[in-house]
Amino acid sequence: MKKYKIIMTGGGSAGHVTPNLALVPKLKELGFEIKYIGSKNGIEKEIITKENIPYYSISSGKLRRYFDIKNFTDPFKVLKGVMDASRILSKEKPDVIFSKGGFVTVPVVIAASMKKIPVVSHESDLTPGLANKIASPFCDTLCVTFPESLKYIKDNKGKLTGTPIREDLLKGDKERGRKFCNFKENKKVLMIIGGSLGSKIINESVRKILNEILKEYNVIHLCGKGNLDESLKNLEGYRQYEYISEELPDLMALADLVISRAGANTIFELLALRKLNILIPLSANASRGDQVLNANSFEKSGYSMVIKEEELNSELLLKSIKDLEKNREKYLNSMKMSKIGNGVNNIIDIIKKSAHM
């Protein structure tokens, strides 16, 4: 019986890596041998090696939308990356490549195309990121998460699959989460997720109105690295953490309402878990504007309340929390009606087909 092999790639941020992990259990169940290609120093190396998946490093230049002197040297790093990836692919002879985006994927996808190895890519955001835009001509299929994304994909390569969500995230234990936080009072739980680096403006806005919030809620605040406030360490009902990984499913199960950035992976997890949410997307000035588009789509569908970062202040945040609670059933019903589910099975079907399984 033929042993099938897949090489996965994606990196630069956790959002380009964790969706890969959501596919791993199913791929293993199907008998796929899994290898990974990432950068030498990216976050993907730490995440993937913890999962005991064989990891290859390649050279990769950063893709920028702005002028930088490195724009003249990085194409040579990409070229070296293509040669690095080509050697790995010649050695491993995979049946299919799965690419999750991030600049490290571009050399891998180009090398795979040159060797006629099928490439399945996935884009979480509403509009394709720069890496997926560049890699798109070399892909066979580009899986997307939002129905609106299909209009941006050329040559009929786009497939609406949804985003892959880790099974363990959907199986959190509320009581285990409560025990972990050790809340004394049995109130509703408000959770704030500012991303792995945190958000200064969200952290400050929340902390200014903590006393008001704590009248109604226990608070779990994922504030990002280096953003703990020591003066609030012993405040009853308030738990702050720089970052949570292992316990996240339990804390998500415990949360009644979530305030979050609008990265695609996070918001689709909130939708899958049917969590009331307020989204504060990273402004277009500080990014390519993908979070603004993601949030607008969710607001239009009735899944989320949205506050623009430029308009955020403590008073507006407190008012929005109260308004969301008043309209709780309306938002929950919209989420229940959503036909967008976990994308794992849809993507696995495309991978199997591409590998001629």
Swiss-Prot record:
<dbReference type="InterPro" id="IPR007235">
    <property type="entry name" value="Glyco_trans_28_C"/>
</dbReference>
<keyword id="KW-0131">Cell cycle</keyword>
<keyword id="KW-0573">Peptidoglycan synthesis</keyword>
<keyword id="KW-0132">Cell division</keyword>
<dbReference type="GO" id="GO:0071555">
    <property type="term" value="P:cell wall organization"/>
</dbReference>
<dbReference type="GO" id="GO:0008360">
    <property type="term" value="P:regulation of cell shape"/>
</dbReference>
<protein>
    <recommendedName>
        <fullName>UDP-N-acetylglucosamine--N-acetylmuramyl-(pentapeptide) pyrophosphoryl-undecaprenol N-acetylglucosamine transferase</fullName>
        <ecNumber>2.4.1.227</ecNumber>
    </recommendedName>
</protein>
<dbReference type="Pfam" id="PF04101">
    <property type="entry name" value="Glyco_tran_28_C"/>
</dbReference>
<keyword id="KW-0961">Cell wall biogenesis/degradation</keyword>
<dbReference type="Pfam" id="PF03033">
    <property type="entry name" value="Glyco_transf_28"/>
</dbReference>
<comment type="similarity">
    <text>Belongs to the glycosyltransferase 28 family. MurG subfamily.</text>
</comment>
<feature type="binding site">
    <location>
        <position position="196"/>
    </location>
    <ligand>
        <name>UDP-N-acetyl-alpha-D-glucosamine</name>
    </ligand>
</feature>
<dbReference type="InterPro" id="IPR006009">
    <property type="entry name" value="GlcNAc_MurG"/>
</dbReference>
<dbReference type="GO" id="GO:0005886">
    <property type="term" value="C:plasma membrane"/>
</dbReference>
<dbReference type="InterPro" id="IPR004276">
    <property type="entry name" value="GlycoTrans_28_N"/>
</dbReference>
<keyword id="KW-1003">Cell membrane</keyword>
<keyword id="KW-0328">Glycosyltransferase</keyword>
<feature type="binding site">
    <location>
        <begin position="13"/>
        <end position="15"/>
    </location>
    <ligand>
        <name>UDP-N-acetyl-alpha-D-glucosamine</name>
    </ligand>
</feature>
<dbReference type="GO" id="GO:0050511">
    <property type="term" value="F:undecaprenyldiphospho-muramoylpentapeptide beta-N-acetylglucosaminyltransferase activity"/>
</dbReference>
<feature type="binding site">
    <location>
        <position position="291"/>
    </location>
    <ligand>
        <name>UDP-N-acetyl-alpha-D-glucosamine</name>
    </ligand>
</feature>
<keyword id="KW-0808">Transferase</keyword>
<comment type="pathway">
    <text>Cell wall biogenesis; peptidoglycan biosynthesis.</text>
</comment>
<keyword id="KW-0133">Cell shape</keyword>
<dbReference type="GO" id="GO:0009252">
    <property type="term" value="P:peptidoglycan biosynthetic process"/>
</dbReference>
<dbReference type="GO" id="GO:0051301">
    <property type="term" value="P:cell division"/>
</dbReference>
<dbReference type="GO" id="GO:0051991">
    <property type="term" value="F:UDP-N-acetyl-D-glucosamine:N-acetylmuramoyl-L-alanyl-D-glutamyl-meso-2,6-diaminopimelyl-D-alanyl-D-alanine-diphosphoundecaprenol 4-beta-N-acetylglucosaminlytransferase activity"/>
</dbReference>
<dbReference type="GO" id="GO:0030259">
    <property type="term" value="P:lipid glycosylation"/>
</dbReference>
<dbReference type="GO" id="GO:0005975">
    <property type="term" value="P:carbohydrate metabolic process"/>
</dbReference>
<comment type="function">
    <text>Cell wall formation. Catalyzes the transfer of a GlcNAc subunit on undecaprenyl-pyrophosphoryl-MurNAc-pentapeptide (lipid intermediate I) to form undecaprenyl-pyrophosphoryl-MurNAc-(pentapeptide)GlcNAc (lipid intermediate II).</text>
</comment>
<keyword id="KW-0472">Membrane</keyword>
<feature type="binding site">
    <location>
        <position position="166"/>
    </location>
    <ligand>
        <name>UDP-N-acetyl-alpha-D-glucosamine</name>
    </ligand>
</feature>
